[in-house]
Each structure stands twice: as structure tokens, then as C-alpha cells.
């Protein structure tokens, strides 16, 4: 594989794809280009005015001066300062139009890219989030997009403004003396070779910088989210060292990029100025063939060239940083969204669930998490799944709403394979409450009436809160249902957060309710109230309960005991106790533990 050969073509392809995001702003972009044309045209104007001024001083009777009626040579010469001011104003106008309108393009591009990237996150499958840390995903939206914007707009600004300046100056120099100008043109292949060589290094280093920046964001994100654990277990030193290591790695990679640029830019300047030195030497040989004004104008125009050439050479690093950032962004955008080939949509289902010979393993694993699982849940029934951690209970619950796709077997709702429902319609029929509660930095009411539930009346929200035994503590909050609860409900207790999650599920009023350790964070009194509330709402719903505390599922119609991905027992509470198998042993173990815990209190 010849990566070095493929990389430039790949860079061009990525860059042109990136520029496609500028298309909605083509009008603004055109105005900015016009501004830079105005700006660039002012450069040779200055050299021309100096030629006119010097020739006027040395030869006041020159035809250019005497050919203007009503004014003598010196009167015309007094107009030169005004011409310089007008050229500066012309240049300022061009700079304003170019910079302002390109900034509008740049800010729009940042918004569009971030929005597109965020929208893609909402469509990606669960497995994508399992394989990518939140820190790296956040870094793409923040750091990478900023780098990409630099390539798409800031780099264009330099390429257009300085590129046009070089074109105008070269055109002027060719018009003045094409033979001398060819000496400067001769260095362009060497400059091109240097730029190509540096571009590969810049892009490679930029990829490493973005990964390192993602590591910094990841460590910071984990520490902030788990700050209670960090402080409780004395992890401050460990996290400090972990962050320092990530930050130092990022700094080293940044410095390597700076070092490459620091060597590359002066080398390019040396080549450019060497060409200028040759030109100046040749100018001395032409003293008798050109006027003093011609020589001054030529030297002035040639002297204006190194700055734009240097800036054009430096823009390579900006472009390659952006291309590397765009590469990671497009990798995410090109990742396949959740598979949704279903076509069936139903207003409401009765809630009959049938699982046939279901098997599943996580990507990259050779262990079956679920192995030939089969069962049926009739509408309105309550089914409980119990078993040791890792037996496959939560995995089974995640397969019903298609958070993952099973390898073998079928899951049917009302006789229709879940794969045949559209994802949105399937999930509308399922309310899910897990042990890991997710709340948002918003009001209590907006956390209960979230997403598709946002338009429901306040009375329905309050009724759901009451049914979830949450209204009692909500009424004690400073602004009641309008109280802001902080990031992930940080101002609430674990039990309060879980009750809000249950209220949200109850408000959804879905025919299928999945409770995955939903009452694990509740105290005994709250759990008793919740169980009573759930008992009422379960009568009209098919309910799948995953529980560790067996006392919470004794009233289930069917209890299924799972072990190593298989259902090893099923029956009612009484039947399973009488059988003396897995369930009876789990029950006896908890029966011994609970009195001991109570005595310890």
C-alpha cells in the first residue's frame, strides 16, 4: 500500500467535500472574493505610483507628466500623496469586504458542521457509543470543528487574498520586465516540492494532536462526571496525574507541529529571498536600460512578494490540520446510522411479546450473552427476570426496543417481528426505566415531559408524578415543577431521580413497560409506594421487570430465572420456591442477608 501516493488525492477529496459545506453561503463567499480582488489589486498600484513619482522627480518633462493639460509636472506630483491615501482606502475597502463576509461564512460553517455532527450522533447505533468515549465525541464537535473551520475559511482567506496578491504582483513584474521575472518563477517548482513534503508531515501530526486532544477531553469529562467517587476514594492525585499525562502528550504533539512549521517557514523564506537577491543583482546590470522609476517600481513590487508567499506556505499547516479534523468528522458522518428497514407503523399495540430461540453476542466477543431464549408474555402480564449479574437480563431488555440487533431468533410484538416496525413507532410503544437514570439540566416538568411528551398538559405531568410517588418531594422544591435540577439531576437524591424517571415512563403511557432495576435506588417506604403505584398501572400494560431484590417481584405472573444467557427456571413465586432450585436458593440467600442488614442498622 503506497500511502504517500494516496494521501494527497485523499486530502484533495476531503478538502473539496469540506468546501461543499460552503455552498449555502456562495453569495457571501463571492462578495468576500471580490473584496480580496480589490485588496490584491492595490499592491501593484503602489509600485506604479512610486514609478510615476520617481520618474517625475528625475524627469519632470517626461511625456507622462506633460501630457496632462492645465497642470504642470510638479502640480501633478503633488497629487501623489493623495493617490497613496486613495490606494490605502481602496485596500481597506477590499480588506473589510473580504474579512467581514468570509467571517459570516466561517461562523455559518461552524454552526452547520456542529449541527450535522450532533444530528449524526442522534442517529448512530448503540454499538458506536460503546466503542467511542464521550470525551472523543465531544472533542470532535468542539476542537475538530474549529480546526476544520480554519481549513475551510481562514485558509481560503489567505489562499485567495495572498494568492491574488502574488498573481497581481507577478503580472505587474512580467509587464515591467518578463526576463527578470522568470528568475523568480524558476523557484516555484522548489517551493511546490517543499509545500508537498511539509503537508504530509502536518497532516500526520494533526491526526495525532486531535487524538491527544480527545484524550484530554475524555479524562476531564470522566473526572467531572465522577467527582464524588474521585473525592470519596481519594482519587485526586491519580486523576491529576492522568490529566497531566494526557495534557503533556498533547503539548508534545503540538510542539512537534510547531517545530516542523518553525523549520519549514524560514527555509522557504531563504529560498524566496535568495531568488530576490539574484533579481537585485541583475537589476544592477540593467541600470542603463531602464529608468530610475522602473527600477524602483520593480524592486518595490518584488519586495512585496515574500510576505504573501510566506503566508501561502504557512497556510499548508492550517489546511492539513483541518483536513485531519475533517477526516475524523466525515468518518463519523459516514458511519451507518441505526438500521431501520421496518415499514410497519401501528397506532397502538396490545403488548403481546413473543421471543423465539433468541441468541446474541456483543460485537468483538465470542461469548453468547443470550443463548436460545424463548418465552411469551401475554398483554397485561407482568414477567420478572432474575438471576446473577451477567446472566443476560439487561441485554434481553435492550433487544426489545432494538438498541442492539440479535444474531439469531425473533422478537415479536403482537405477532410482528420488531425488525418490521419502524424504529420510531416501535419505541413509541415501549417505556423503559433503567437503574442508570438520565436527567437533563432543565426543570422537573421538562424532565418528566421529555421529547415526544413535551406537548402534554401540565395536569398530565402532575398526575404521572403523583403516580410515580414523585409529587410529594417535587412540591417541597423551591419552584415546584419549575425547579431547575442541575446536570443529570445533581440537586436530587438517587431515589428522587429514579422516581422522576418512573414518572416519565408512566407519562408515556406505553403498552409495554420495561423496568430494569428501576426501584434499586429507592428507600423501603418509597419502594412500597412505587410498587403500589406500579401495580395499578401494570394492569393495563405488559410489564417486564428486571430485579435484584426478589421481594419486589413476588406478585409477577411469571418469574424467569436466567443463568449464563439461558432461562433455567420459570414459574410463579410459590411454584419456584416449592421447586427448590435456583430461585429458591437466591430467595433464601436474600432472606438471610436482609435481617442481618436490618440488625446492622
Swiss-Prot record:
Keywords on record: ATP-binding, Cell inner membrane, Cell membrane, Lipid transport, Membrane, Nucleotide-binding, Translocase, Transmembrane, Transmembrane helix, Transport
EC number(s) on file: 7.5.2.6
Compartments it resides in: Cell inner membrane
UniProt entry tagged with the keyword Mitochondrion: no
Occurrences of domain ABC transmembrane type-1 (ranges): 30-321
Coiled-coil region: none
Pfam families reported in the protein's UniProt record: ABC_membrane (PF00664), ABC_tran (PF00005)
PROSITE patterns documented for this protein: ABC_TM1F, ABC_TRANSPORTER_1, ABC_TRANSPORTER_2, MSBA
Residues passing through the membrane, by range: 26-46, 82-102, 167-187, 263-283
Amino acids binding ATP: 387-394
Ranges of residues in domain ABC transporter: 353-589
Gene3D superfamilies the record matches: ABC transporter type 1, transmembrane domain, P-loop containing nucleotide triphosphate hydrolases
Protein's membrane topology: Multi-pass membrane protein
Molecular functions (GO terms): ABC-type oligopeptide transporter activity; ATP binding; ATP hydrolysis activity; ATPase-coupled lipid transmembrane transporter activity
CDD domains hit by this protein: ABC_6TM_MsbA_like (cd18552)
Primary localisation category: membrane
Free-text note regarding domains: In MsbA the ATP-binding domain (NBD) and the transmembrane domain (TMD) are fused.
Subunit structure as annotated in this protein's UniProt entry: Homodimer.
Sequence similarity: Belongs to the ABC transporter superfamily. Lipid exporter (TC 3.A.1.106) family.
Known role: Involved in lipopolysaccharide (LPS) biosynthesis. Translocates lipid A-core from the inner to the outer leaflet of the inner membrane. Transmembrane domains (TMD) form a pore in the inner membrane and the ATP-binding domain (NBD) is responsible for energy generation.
Name of this protein: ATP-dependent lipid A-core flippase
Source organism per UniProt: Aromatoleum aromaticum (strain DSM 19018 / LMG 30748 / EbN1) (Azoarcus sp. (strain EbN1))
